[in-house]
């Protein structure tokens, strides 16, 4: 990206910081992570969780959801103005699991939001530490990306379910700021824009008046975020058209769907960060690790290191496979839901299988599930190598991909060919070049057709031994590209339901 000089790194977005040098960034990200860890330790004390219970990922998720809810100002305001039966707008809670006489029991807890906010601020030197909250949101988003398909949501907005590799971050709340915007896939942005345009079509006051002016500003901002993800001039020019439209309607929806499809080959830049469950940070802080002093990066070796030395657990349903549960969480931790499985397998040092072959449901346990039969097992989150997370889609080229997911969105900066099913992608573009964006469409289609299989993405980038923390000796793996590389291939993952 030519504009690299003017861009803030994700760590800077993550910590809300202005431009800083590498050491300052590592320190401010470390400060954020340390604050999250201190908060977790304090919550475990408040809830009287044993060491083992504090390492249970389900307890971690409940605590995370409580703090996100405590700071969700818009929802809190809404709840106070629209009191609903049996919901106290000032309280938040969830299931906490405890081991009693060798059995896991569920206990529903309720806390004052004010109290949670106090504990959070206290752990973060008295500040609101919004960056830490966003970090937790991204971890939840990465977990959703690895767990669920978005077929229904894609179909509802007129997109193709096979475009699932573009849907990173589709469950992130709008309030997730610049760091959240950086990790959203092209499909996610397109879907948000289409929903907005559809509301405008159905409600003639949507773009009018003082509210409409704010809506318009939000629309243009989202268009600019999406434009910034595209790497070719023609795609960006098309986004300018969509943004400048006086009265966005079906023509804009068409253009956006066209752009989303084009991103299967002309990939957008989507950031990837390893965001870990809060209990992992808590364990590290409790064992005396000083994140701010040591510094931390979300895109380097640090998260791999942390996972090498933390033992955390998960509840397991009777017919689930603990190894599969571990894979799900490993993928979520490294934001690798849409990465090529061959790359993930190499880095993890264990075969990573497609979603459809996993004998596991999501990590969270529904309130009506029977606890009698629940067991717990250790999550195996270690890796054989580490690799730098990427913020670009890599160069583009042709390769066979699959019936389910027809492209990948790389997570790790590792040299390889990027697979996608050229025939399938191109079939979507037949004869669709009329209208005011026709020259751009023609140009985009031409670029897609000329993308070559032998072009290697991330030239010379490789994986590193875990002892090579300065990334000095890259190992460039060779992949057997004849195999299937998509995670959501021919898939039966559950749908994501709010």
UniProtKB/Swiss-Prot annotation:
Motif (Bipartite nuclear localization signal): 198-216
GO terms under biological process: symbiont entry into host cell; viral penetration into host nucleus
Organism domain of life: Viruses
InterPro entries linked: Flu_NP (IPR002141)
Main subcellular location of this protein, as a coarse class: virion
Quaternary structure note: Homomultimerizes to form the nucleocapsid. May bind host exportin-1/XPO1. Binds to viral genomic RNA. Protein-RNA contacts are mediated by a combination of electrostatic interactions between positively charged residues and the phosphate backbone and planar interactions between aromatic side chains and bases.
Family: Belongs to the influenza viruses nucleoprotein family.
Protein name: Nucleoprotein
Species, as recorded: Influenza A virus (strain A/Swine/Ohio/23/1935 H1N1)
């Amino acid at each position: 990206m030519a504009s690299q000089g003017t861009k803030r790194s994700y760590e800077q977005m993550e910590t809300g910081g202005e431009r800083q040098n590498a050491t300052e960034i590592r320190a401010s990200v470390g400060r954020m992570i340390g604050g999250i860890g201190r908060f977790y330790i304090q919550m475990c004390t408040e809830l009287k969780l044993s060491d083992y219970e504090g390492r249970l990922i389900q307890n971690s998720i409940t605590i995370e959801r409580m703090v996100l809810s405590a700071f969700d100002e818009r929802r809190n305001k809404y709840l106070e103005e629209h009191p609903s039966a049996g919901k106290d707008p000032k309280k938040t809670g969830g299931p906490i699991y405890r081991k009693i006489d060798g059995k896991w029991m569920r206990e529903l807890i309720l806390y004052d939001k004010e109290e949670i906010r106090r504990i959070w601020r206290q752990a973060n030197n008295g500040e609101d530490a919004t960056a830490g909250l966003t970090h937790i949101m991204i971890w939840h988003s990465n977990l959703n990306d690895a767990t669920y398909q978005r077929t229904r949501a894609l179909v509802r907005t007129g997109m193709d379910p096979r475009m699932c590799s573009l849907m990173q971050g589709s469950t992130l709340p709008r309030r997730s700021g610049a760091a959240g915007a950086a990790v959203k896939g092209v499909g996610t942005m397109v879907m948000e824009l289409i929903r907005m345009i559809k509301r405008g079509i159905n409600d003639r006051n949507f773009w009018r008046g003082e509210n409409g002016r704010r809506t318009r500003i939000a629309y243009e901002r989202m268009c600019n975020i999406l434009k910034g993800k595209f790497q070719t001039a023609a795609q960006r020019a098309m986004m300018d058209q969509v943004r400048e439209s006086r009265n966005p309607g079906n023509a804009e929806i068409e253009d956006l769907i066209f752009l989303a499809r084009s991103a299967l080959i002309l990939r957008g830049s989507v950031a990837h960060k390893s965001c870990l469950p809060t209990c992992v940070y808590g364990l590290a802080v409790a064992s005396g690790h000083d994140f701010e002093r040591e510094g931390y990066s979300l895109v380097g070796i640090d998260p791999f290191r942390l996972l090498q030395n933390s033992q955390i657990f998960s509840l397991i349903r009777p017919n689930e496979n603990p190894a599969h549960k571990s894979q799900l969480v490993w993928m979520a931790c490294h934001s690798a839901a849409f990465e090529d499985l061959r790359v993930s397998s190499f880095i993890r040092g264990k075969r990573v299988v497609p979603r459809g072959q996993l004998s596991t449901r999501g990590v969270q346990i529904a309130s009506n599930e029977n606890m009698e039969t629940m067991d717990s097992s250790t999550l195996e989150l270690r890796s054989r190598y580490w690799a730098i997370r990427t913020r670009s889609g890599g160069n583009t080229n042709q390769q066979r991909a699959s019936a389910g997911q027809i492209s990948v969105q790389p997570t790790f900066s590792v040299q390889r060919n990027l697979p996608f099913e050229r025939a399938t992608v191109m079939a979507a573009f037949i004869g669709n070049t009329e209208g005011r964006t026709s020259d751009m469409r023609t140009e985009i289609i031409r670029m897609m057709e000329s993308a070559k299989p032998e072009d290697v993405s991330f030239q010379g980038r490789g994986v590193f031994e875990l002892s090579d923390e300065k990334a000095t000796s890259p190992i460039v793996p060779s992949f057997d590209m004849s195999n299937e590389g998509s995670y959501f291939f021919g898939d039966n993952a559950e749908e994501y339901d709010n």
